[in-house]
UniProtKB/Swiss-Prot annotation:
InterPro entries: Aminotransferase_I/II_large, DapL/ALD1, PyrdxlP-dep_Trfase, PyrdxlP-dep_Trfase_major, PyrdxlP-dep_Trfase_small. This is LL-diaminopimelate aminotransferase. One of its GO terms (molecular function) is pyridoxal phosphate binding. The lineage of its organism: Bacteria, Bacillati, Cyanobacteriota, Cyanophyceae, Synechococcales. HAMAP family: DapL_aminotrans_1 (MF_01642). Disulfide bonds: none annotated. It comes from Synechococcus sp. (strain WH7803).
Length: 408
């Protein structure tokens, strides 16, 4: 009998969102007439921008001709998309990032997991708590942790608690670590980082030869022009950071799949013998071996995000979801709940009322208001007593959900 990867057996009962799905399915089976409103998983609801749809239609038509047909594309992404990304997302903000350092992919979730392929198993890993579960689970799957304890924390990981007490800003670790996951704007708390806060992390990473894995999937939702959108706005970050970005939330590509990862040339790790090795070369080799590239049609759609029309439509989508977040903040605050986030991110982080635990509040909203959210404890032990609501839904559903919750 074939032997399985035993690391998967260390995983807790289920990934957070499938567990939510199981509970919702059971509720719906018992209550078939209930009109559920889902403010849990961060999936967008509004249509793709017209500029992107038009570009993809043109690409589809081109694929129907001998002259315009495209087969396998470059694993790293087409040059015209990489150039557009470098120009609009990085050079426009003063970041020294070239097109060659951008690798187009089918999702930042995939990349934040796959990046472990090029990093050694012995690295000491630090994550915030609460945290996007993929960072933890992918390290468990890769054999970088021990077993989970009673609170769900895995042996071998360094957990950096974030809460209202520290402004949802993790403290620099007291012990040296090699790999640091940072996400700003933060999922799940909605917190943001200033340039000064990111500089402290960059300084730590450079002083300790650590690598920062920076998830900027929600950077488009930042409203304050003084806040950084990229780790590469910080001097020295090229020497110690990799950044993940996505078209999923700003341009609605959750169903079409397009993202990118930035690996600066010259960024180095070390081999077992101590020799310095360029990470760009390793990631390029990894992608060339294990990835066939994103569809030509989808990449043309992503390129259109950077057109004048595309930029205007993306701005409109971001504004729509941020207004949803503002409604959630306002209405739940008026209902007496303590609210965080939702000002620079599409997530609102709620302190559960009356000492209720996270899953208890989940069941309460599901059963009494027919509203689905995400229990904070699913993001880590320090998320217990909190609850996340997503602003990704129609205005009518957000208004109705708030009315139901306020009526409880």
């Amino acid at each position: 009998m074939v032997q399985v990867n035993g690391n998967y057996l260390k995983l807790k009962a289920g990934y957070l969102f499938p567990e939510i799905g199981r509970r919702v399915k059971a509720f719906s089976a018992a209550n078939p007439d209930a009109a559920l409103i889902r403010l849990g998983i961060g999936d967008v609801t509004e249509p793709l921008p017209q500029a992107c749809r038009d570009a993809m239609k043109t690409a589809i038509d081109a694929m129907g001709t001998a002259e315009g047909f495209h087969g396998y594309g470059p694993e790293q992404g087409y040059g015209w998309l990489r150039e557009a990304i470098a120009t609009h997302d990085f050079k426009a903000r003063g970041c020294d990032i070239s097109a060659e350092e951008i690798f187009v992919s089918d999702g930042s979730k995939c990349d934040s997991s796959n990046i472990l392929d090029i990093l050694g198993e012995g690295n000491r890993v630090a994550v915030t708590d609460p945290v996007y579960p993929v960072y933890v689970d992918s390290n468990v799957m890769a054999g970088r942790t021990g077993d989970a304890g009673d609170e769900g924390r895995y042996a071998g990981l360094t957990y950096l608690p974030i809460s209202a007490d520290n402004g949802f800003a993790a403290q620099i670790p007291s012990d040296p670590v090699d790999l640091i996951y940072l996400c700003f704007p933060n999922n799940p708390t909605g917190a943001v980082a200033t340039k000064e806060q990111l500089k402290a992390w960059v300084d730590y990473a450079r002083a300790n030869d650590a690598l920062i894995l920076f998830d900027a999937a929600y950077e488009a939702f930042i409203q304050d022009p003084s806040l950084p959108h990229s780790i590469f706005e910080i001097e020295g970050a090229r020497d110690c950071a990799i950044e993940f970005r996505s078209f999923s939330k700003n341009a609605g590509f959750t169903g079409t799949r397009c993202a990118f990862t930035v690996v600066p040339k010259g960024l180095k790790g070390k081999a077992a013998n101590g020799e310095a090795v360029e990470l760009w070369s390793l990631w390029n080799r990894r992608q060339s071996t294990k990835f066939n590239g994103v569809s030509y049609i989808i990449q043309r759609g992503a390129e259109a995000v950077y057109s004048e029309a595309g930029q205007a439509e993306v701005k409109g989508l971001v504004s729509f979801y941020m207004e949803n977040a503002a409604i959630i903040r306002r209405e739940l605050s008026a209902a007496g709940l303590t609210i965080y986030g939702g000002e620079h991110a599409p997530y609102v982080w709620i302190k559960t009322p009356d000492g209720m635990d996270s899953w208890g509040f989940f069941d309460h909203l599901l059963n009494k208001a027919n509203v689905v959210g995400t229990p904070g404890s699913g993001f880590g032990a320090a998320g217990e007593g909190y609850f996340r609501l997503s602003a990704f839904n129609s205005r009518a559903n957000v208004d109705e959900a708030m009315a139901r919750i306020k009526a409880l």
